[in-house]
């Protein structure tokens, strides 16, 4: 080896340490180590697998940043986009085996999840699962269980979500530095319990998560805990306490400039005010929520705000409603169709337009059937 050339094995050990900081959401430590590794790569002996491993960790690093805090608050500049990193990884893949194959599929699943492409995410996760035997680190196994549990929840596969989140939680709770993940586990427990109509137990998880998030001083998690508590009350038709918690979520996100989380909370506040007949308040939140959806390039919530326009302000506009549903069908977002079709069915029922109401109740039933059928879609070969 030439003098001054750094062994790839030494850089590999640093990348492993970098990943430990990423998994514990230790942003400053992760940033420092990333910068050190970038310098060492310039003097490292050539190793194509190690370079791909670095690219994967850079990708995972960016996923952490995108979730946890806005970049402008962290004072981190010139971060590559996830789409750029994804293209770089795809272009550098060879015949991957073992642990690298696991990471490629696992991190790609996280990327697809971030785009709300849930079936695609689970498809990649299940490819990663085939290589899970190469993962000796029990924390990394917990990461896998946690991420696939999240995706199963969004596809309304409650049984599989709860099994995996229990596996993840039992590993994280034995550690001293994984409080962020423990908080997130409580979120996943809670939302699944809501789907089982066990609201009391769900609220316990959310309140415990809120207390932990406040202790950790993580604004994103505090806001998410408030949002989940609002959702818990909303699903029980307790609209006033639901709005109180959604407002707290909005206040937390806005004060910390966590704009990516705002469209979701604004949407439900807007919907509640429309349902209560408070159209002036609804219009105020509708306008701001739609602007946030556009600002953050959140096409899903932009379409949902357009749905509210079609239902409540355009007398209603059947073509606009169906345009929203077609968009959601194209993304296999049948859980969202179920929720929104139910809103339309109830609205028409209250207006005594029973034939239209019945047609949307049938759409609710069809969406539920599609959710039940969705498990087989995860086996698509990629």
Curated annotation (Swiss-Prot):
Disruption phenotype: Deletion of the gene increases the expression of the ComA-dependent genes rapA and rapC itself. InterPro entries: Bac_ResReg_Asp_Phosphatase, TPR-like_helical_dom_sf, TPR_rpt. It is found in: Cytoplasm. Changing residue 263 to L: Prevents inhibition by CSF. Pfam families: RapH_N, TPR_12. Induction: Part of the rapC-phrC operon, which is controlled by the P1 promoter. Transcription from the P1 promoter is activated by high cell density through the phosphorylated form of ComA. RapC is part of an autoregulatory loop, and it negatively regulates its own expression. Inhibited by the competence and sporulation stimulating factor (CSF), encoded by phrC, which prevents RapC-ComA interaction. TPR repeats lie at residues 102-138, 149-182, 183-216, 223-256, 263-296. GO terms for cellular component: cytoplasm. GO terms for biological process: establishment of competence for transformation. Homodimer. Interacts specifically with the C-terminal DNA-binding domain of ComA. Interacts with CSF. Belongs to the Rap family. This is Regulatory protein RapC. It comes from Bacillus subtilis (strain 168). The lineage of its organism: Bacteria, Bacillati, Bacillota, Bacilli, Bacillales.
């Amino acid at each position: 080896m030439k003098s001054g050339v750094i062994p790839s094995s030494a850089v590999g050990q640093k990348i492993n340490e970098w990943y430990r900081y990423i998994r514990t959401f230790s942003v400053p430590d992760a940033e420092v180590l990333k910068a050190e590794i970038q310098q060492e790569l310039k003097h490292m002996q050539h190793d194509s697998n190690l370079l791909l491993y670095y690219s994967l960790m850079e990708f995972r690093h960016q996923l952490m940043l995108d979730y946890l805090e806005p970049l402008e608050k962290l004072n981190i500049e010139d971060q590559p986009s996830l789409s750029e990193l994804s293209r770089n990884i795809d272009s550098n893949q060879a015949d991957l085996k073992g642990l690298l194959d696991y990471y490629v599929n696992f991190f790609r699943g996280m990327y697809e999840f971030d785009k709300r492409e849930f079936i695609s995410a689970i498809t990649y996760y299940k490819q990663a699962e085939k290589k899970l035997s190469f993962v000796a680190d029990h924390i990394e196994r917990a990461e896998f269980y946690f991420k696939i549990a999240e995706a199963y929840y969004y596809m309304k596969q409650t049984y599989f979500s709860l099994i995996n989140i229990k596996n993840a939680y039992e590993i994280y709770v034995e550690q001293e530095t994984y409080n962020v993940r423990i908080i997130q586990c409580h979120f996943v427990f809670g939302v699944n319990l809501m789907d089982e109509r066990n609201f009391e137990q769900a609220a316990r998880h959310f309140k415990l998560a809120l207390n932990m998030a406040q202790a950790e001083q993580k604004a994103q998690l505090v806001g998410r805990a408030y949002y989940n508590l609002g959702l818990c009350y909303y699903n029980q038709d307790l609209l006033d306490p639901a709005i109180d918690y959604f407002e707290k979520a909005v206040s937390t996100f806005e004060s910390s400039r966590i704009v990516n989380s705002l469209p979701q909370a604004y949407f439900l506040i807007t919907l509640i005010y429309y349902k209560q007949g408070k159209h002036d308040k609804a219009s105020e939140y509708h306008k701001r929520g739609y602007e946030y959806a556009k600002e953050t390039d959140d096409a899903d919530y932009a379409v949902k705000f357009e749905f509210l326009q079609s239902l409540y302000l355009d007398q209603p506009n059947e073509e606009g409603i169906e345009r929203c549903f077609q968009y959601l069908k194209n993304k296999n977002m049948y859980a969202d169709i179920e929720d929104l079709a139910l809103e339309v069915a109830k609205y028409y029922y209250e207006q005594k337009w029973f034939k239209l109401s019945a047609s949307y109740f049938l759409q609710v039933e069809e969406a539920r059937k599609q959710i039940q059928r969705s498990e087989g879609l995860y086996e698509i070969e990629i």
